[in-house]
Amino acid sequence: MIRQPRPAKRLLHHLMALDRTDQTVQIEEIPVACPRLPAAFHGARVAVVADVHFPDALLSIPALVDCVAIQNPGAIFLPGDLTNSYTFFDEVRLAKLAKALSAIAPCYAVAGNHEMRLGREKRYGAILERNGIHYLSDSYADWTMKGETIRLFGAARKRPTPLAVDGQPSVVITHKPDRFHYYCRARWELVVCGHAHGGQMRLGEHSLYAPGQGFFPTYSGGVYTADNTVMVVSRGLGNSSIPWRVSNRPHLPVLILQPKL
């Protein structure tokens, strides 16, 4: 008589098989409308590198850098959690990644909750700055293309202050998507963030769990719009406290900026 695997064991094997297939990076091109976009930025590409979580990244540094480089980005946004507070502060890998990415395109970064939890936010920022990345902590930097400029803000405060520059779109890099209603109230036009890890396990557009949102989160990955605010949420490139990603491949969004869609 042939024994059939028990249902629980079959489910476990199925989840493990899915988990193994989820290690390849999904590169997702996302057209984004910015109505006041300067002409030099029409069609500009922005790679979003979020939630790498060294030393628990799902890709090696060369593999990740290659994925970004072939997208030919005009800029790279890093919305936090390049490190993992549950293991250790991996300064060596952080510096290597920062140096390699800054050689591709101008890079703009904020801290995530893992950097803040470690109490290493200043150290994190110093490593990034030393290796060519603009570190934004409730501050801004200018991204220039062909003589025209967009001011980029990095937001770390829980309740953001409305920010605007006359004649320019308000573009903000921050970490947490669960503050979307604050971002809308601040009238930010484009917000780029991570943190939710795609909800860990996905079934179509539905996901299981995200930090700060709990089970069945609203903002786990993709594009969200309300009023005049567009928020793009990366599903991230690494693992943290929950080691499995099921039907949830590592995610490299590439924003394609347009004046309208």
Enumerate the predicted regions with their spans:
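Acidic, histidine-bearing metal-coordination/catalytic regions of metal-dependent phosphoesterases
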Residues: 1-46
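Short, P/G- and charge-enriched loop/turn segments at secondary-structure junctions
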Residues: 15-20, 210, 240-243
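Short amphipathic alpha-helices and their capping/turn segments at secondary-structure boundaries
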Residues: 33-37, 62-71, 183-184
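Conserved catalytic scaffold of divalent metal-dependent phosphoesterases
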Residues: 34-39, 54, 84, 113-190, ...
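Residues at the starts of beta-strands that form the adenosine-phosphate
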Residues: 45, 72-75, 106, 149, ...
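Residue-level marker for buried hydrophobic side chains located in beta-strands
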Residues: 45-48, 76-78, 109, 172, ...
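Conserved acidic
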Residues: 51
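Core catalytic region of metal-dependent phosphoesterases/phosphodiesterases
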Residues: 54, 58-143
